[in-house]
């Protein structure tokens, strides 16, 4: 079901009070007045704290700055019409006990009348005493079809001719933006270039990046890495290559279900985060990085609200890759009593969304340990696959040396004795190998000469890898993966 069908069903089923979570008040009003309540025997009343009721000339300004009076108006209104009352930001008054009582009483009264209340809010924070009275619905961001219609409407209004391919490209770039933000961005582009063309795309993407970063939950992450930049992990690469077209229309028509994502468990520095970036690059999808710690807020209900906001943004930008780094740290205190169950509720919401989502949001979660991972997360069906990224073997270490040296010395990397170096760094991670190369460069640069194989050898000999400093943890993780609990990322 889509939003309109869901809302129509709730109204027909006599759900008295519905809270719609959205920042797009204007778009919501348009949908309600033009697609839901558009008949002569249907009336829509809009109220806000500053202007009171505004939709009906006979009641303009009524109940201004008086939310209780606004509810009394609903109770006393006696008309033969179907009535819908849109109350904006009404949740701001949920700390008023008298108003809460009035809402509960009113919900019982209007069940038998042709009245419904819609509360419009950009956050969801309902007191427990109203949880059985108010039903929450999210207004999703405009889909591709809606965006195309809006871009076409704007171009016609501004006298600009667009071909179908450009409309499609602009619409894809605008995914994740509200209708109002799309209008502003398109207008900004026209003001700069005098028309809409391929030059518009970077402006739209930058607008999207700024908007997403403003949420402080998600970061529109730049990526310049491909799977070719990762040394080894051939089993994981093969798995990803097989699914590179999983979000295409052809895949959908073939009947392939939308991929859920991956859980990458492994020792630090083995390429988990790099893999997330490479997936987005290879699949040409936007990469969103979630700081899952920022989901947790200090106010009651705030964490759950942030989780819903994250889902709305990610799904609005789909198809995309959602990268959740070090997810094991976020839910380490899942069953503790110190946060009044907030972690458990947020985790439950996340797991439910992960299991049931149908939108093409490919989740890549990384974890350095398994001790803190809840067993529910490791259950089959949460992710498409769980991969274990172990310390690289000798062949993979050679490839890692080659990748790094070819990047910094593209013309002379073959002068380095890579085979000898890879034998000297058993139990080194890829990140540790890179750090040893950087250290050798510092040494040579300070002596005003080119760094050599010998410099790298000395750096490796002085380096103590994590496999020795945290031996117990590394061996524990390897034993866990060795028992068949995860698929090895290397062949």
UniProtKB/Swiss-Prot annotation:
Source species, domain of life: Eukaryota
UniProt subcellular location: Plastid, Chloroplast
GO MF assignments: ATP binding; ATP hydrolysis activity
InterPro entries for the chain: AAA+_ATPase, AAA_domain_protein, ATPase_AAA_core, P-loop_NTPase
SUPFAM superfamilies: P-loop containing nucleoside triphosphate hydrolases
UniProt keyword annotations, A-Z: ATP-binding, Chloroplast, Nucleotide-binding, Plastid
Residues holding ATP: 266-273
GO cellular component labels: chloroplast
Family: Belongs to the AAA ATPase family. Highly divergent.
PANTHER family: YCF46 PROTEIN
Protein's UniProt name: Uncharacterized AAA domain-containing protein ycf46
Species whose genome carries this gene: Porphyra purpurea
Gene from which this protein is expressed: ycf46
